[in-house]
């Protein structure tokens, strides 16, 4: 794949992921390939934003749809929205 396959997406963080990342999100997270496995995408995000400590406890969402199977390959387009959602507890 060439560099022209990369896409820019909106990235949102919630709860603990926001706290660890130090930002609520960004409008220009660069994904290196338009087609990518959810697990690879989550690894990219966790490595870039120091979220490795919660990597195994978060849910990745793509355009408000949970990526239930991290081995699934998804297609990302410019302007898509990704969200990192940690477990939420409360009463």
Swiss-Prot record:
Residues carrying Glycyl adenylate: 91
Residues annotated as signal peptide: none
Single GO cellular component term: molybdopterin synthase complex
Chloroplast is among the record's keywords: no
Main location class: cytoplasm
Keywords: Cytoplasm, Molybdenum cofactor biosynthesis, Nucleotide-binding, Phosphoprotein
Modified residues (1-thioglycine): 91
Post-translational changes noted in the entry: C-terminal thiocarboxylation occurs in 2 steps, it is first acyl-adenylated (-COAMP) via the hesA/moeB/thiF part of MOCS3, then thiocarboxylated (-COSH) via the rhodanese domain of MOCS3.
A single GO BP: Mo-molybdopterin cofactor biosynthetic process
Keyword Nucleotide-binding part of the UniProt annotation: yes
UniProt pathway annotation: Cofactor biosynthesis; molybdopterin biosynthesis
Molecular functions per Gene Ontology: molybdopterin synthase activity; nucleotide binding
Family annotation (Pfam families): ThiS
Subcellular localization: Cytoplasm
Source species, domain of life: Eukaryota
Subunit structure comment from the entry: Heterotetramer; composed of 2 small (MOCS2A) and 2 large (MOCS2B) subunits.
Similarity comment: Belongs to the MoaD family. MOCS2A subfamily.
Additional free-text comment from the UniProt record: This protein is produced by a bicistronic gene which also produces the large subunit (MOCS2B).
PANTHER family (UniProt xref): MOLYBDOPTERIN SYNTHASE SULFUR CARRIER SUBUNIT
Function as written in the Swiss-Prot or TrEMBL entry: Acts as a sulfur carrier required for molybdopterin biosynthesis. Component of the molybdopterin synthase complex that catalyzes the conversion of precursor Z into molybdopterin by mediating the incorporation of 2 sulfur atoms into precursor Z to generate a dithiolene group. In the complex, serves as sulfur donor by being thiocarboxylated (-COSH) at its C-terminus by MOCS3. After interaction with MOCS2B, the sulfur is then transferred to precursor Z to form molybdopterin.
Protein name, UniProt field: Molybdopterin synthase sulfur carrier subunit
């Amino acid at each position: 794949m060439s560099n022209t396959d990369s896409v820019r997406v909106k990235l949102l963080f919630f709860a603990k992921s926001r706290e660890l990342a130090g930002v609520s999100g960004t409008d220009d997270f660069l994904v290196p390939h338009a087609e990518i496995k959810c697990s690879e995408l989550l690894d990219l995000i966790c490595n870039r934003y120091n979220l490795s400590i919660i990597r195994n406890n978060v849910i990745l969402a793509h355009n408000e749809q949970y990526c239930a199977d991290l081995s699934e390959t998804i297609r990302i387009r410019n302007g898509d929205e990704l969200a990192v959602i940690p477990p939420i507890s409360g009463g």
